[in-house]
Regions:
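Short internal beta-strands
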Residues: 355-364
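Glycine-rich, proline-tolerant flexible connector loops at the mouths of alpha/beta enzymes
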Residues: 332-336
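Short amphipathic alpha-helix used as the core "switch/output" element in two-component signaling
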Residues: 346-347
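ATP-dependent carboxylate/acyl-activation modules
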Residues: 1-211, 215-329, 339-341, 350, ...
């Protein structure tokens, strides 16, 4: 689950991480009032969407598609500039490297006080699933695309792994700060800030907290100038306040409906729909589709206890994507029974008048019953012996990749 920058800043502030004063706004008038309230010589006018790269993005009119303004984050030195930038941002489409060509409609602004900047850093806390730890990434190259830094100058990125049993140790914070060239007051400020940021990460069940840039001021203070925060939705039951932080307008309507039906769905840019049980198997299925020249249109995990109605809903959601030219069903029955999936597939195919190629691979619990149900139907369903066979068949049936 993602939240906006202004929400992330409030979370950081609540947990003792230094941030600048700012105001969340939804209208131009609110932005002007925020400027007056902040009483700062310079302010940042920041578009708020659930995507990175806002500063380097472009804003377009929704109707005509004409360019409105370059950059979704602007520095304003006057009330008039705040008005101009706010008018150009609110209600328009922001396209960034992370939004895709369709972009996102900007409904929220964050007006933030400015500060002097002596140096910009990159800092992020992430879940490292391979090492079963929290990974801290930091670089002296803040304010830039970290992917670009990693590609061109990987030696400038510093990584440390934190054992969740012992937590962040003081020497780790010190070593990281020194690796970034900090000393004296700035090093102490960094160590204090990082300890609070780590505690926030753990206590709020975050999967990512990214600050780009983290800045050192002329007074050697350390301040979070940006924030990107994501939560682990599996921990939602522990955090009742997450409902208040969720911005449904930033989420795909079809993904919301999928969640309400007990399905995990993420739309992608390909043309082969995927219906799979289990997140790991779903990702493996997408990988194998790409291996054989296809492009997955979605990630869809029906879970371990799906019923016929959920399978039907899953098909309906997949087929809402006009780019889908074929569907691959890949089920490994453990808790899930293959006969239930087979009946759901048939019910969905009949109810939705399926007119795209369908390949079904079944394995595991009640697999023989499931295969028999599919074989006895008069529907045009292509069985597959294994995942590789299924991926090759669906790619061939749709005439190749995208």
């Amino acid at each position: 689950m993602n939240i906006h920058e202004y929400q992330g800043k409030e979370l950081l502030r609540t947990n003792g991480v230094p941030v600048l004063e700012g105001v969340h706004c939804k209208t131009v008038d609110e932005a002007l009032a925020a400027y007056d309230k902040l009483n700062s010589k310079v302010v940042a006018v920041k578009s708020q969407i659930h995507a990175g790269g806002r500063g380097k993005g472009n804003l377009y009119f929704p109707e005509s598609g004409d360019l409105v303004m370059e950059g979704g984050v602007k520095i304003a030195f006057s009330r008039e500039e705040v008005k101009t930038y706010s008018e150009n941002i609110l209600g328009n489409i922001l396209v960034t490297i992370q939004t895709g060509e369709s972009g996102k409609l900007v409904r929220n602004l964050y007006i933030e006080s400015g500060c002097d900047i002596a140096h910009e850093y990159y800092l992020a806390l992430l879940v490292d699933r391979e090492k079963k730890s929290v990974m801290i990434m930091a670089s002296t190259e803040g304010g830039m695309d970290i992917e670009e830094v990693a590609h061109n100058t990987p030696e400038l990125i510093h990584r440390i792994s934190i054992d969740p049993n012992s937590g962040l140790m003081g020497f780790q914070s010190r070593d990281l700060g020194m690796a970034l060239g900090m000393s004296g007051k700035s090093l102490k400020s960094f160590m204090k800030m990082l300890a609070k940021m780590y505690n926030m990460f753990v206590s709020n069940d975050c999967t990512m907290v990214e600050i780009n840039p983290l800045v050192k001021t002329d007074n050697d203070d350390i301040v979070a100038l940006d924030s990107k925060v994501s939560f682990d939705e599996n921990a939602e039951f522990r955090h009742k306040n997450w409902d208040d932080m969720r911005d449904l307008s930033e989420e795909e309507e079809v993904e919301i409906r999928a969640k309400e039906s007990g399905l995990s769905y993420v739309k992608l840019d390909g043309n082969i729909g995927c219906l799979v049980n289990g997140a790991g198997l779903a990702m493996a299925t997408m990988d194998v589709i790409k291996l054989y020249g296809g492009e997955p249109a979605n990630f869809l995990d029906v879970g371990g206890g799906a019923n016929e109605e959920q399978v039907k809903t899953a098909f309906s959601i997949i087929l809402e994507d006009p780019n889908v030219k074929g569907i691959l069903v890949n089920i490994f029955g453990g808790i899930m029974r293959c006969d239930i999936i087979a009946r759901g597939v048939i019910a969905a195919t009949e109810a939705l008048s399926l007119d795209v190629p369908l390949v079904v691979r079944l394995a595991g619990t009640n697999v023989d019953e499931g295969k028999a149900i599919l074989a006895e139907s008069t529907l045009n369903i292509h069985p597959a012996d294994d995942l590789a066979d299924g991926a090759q068949k669906i790619v061939a049936l749709i005439g190749g990749g995208v």
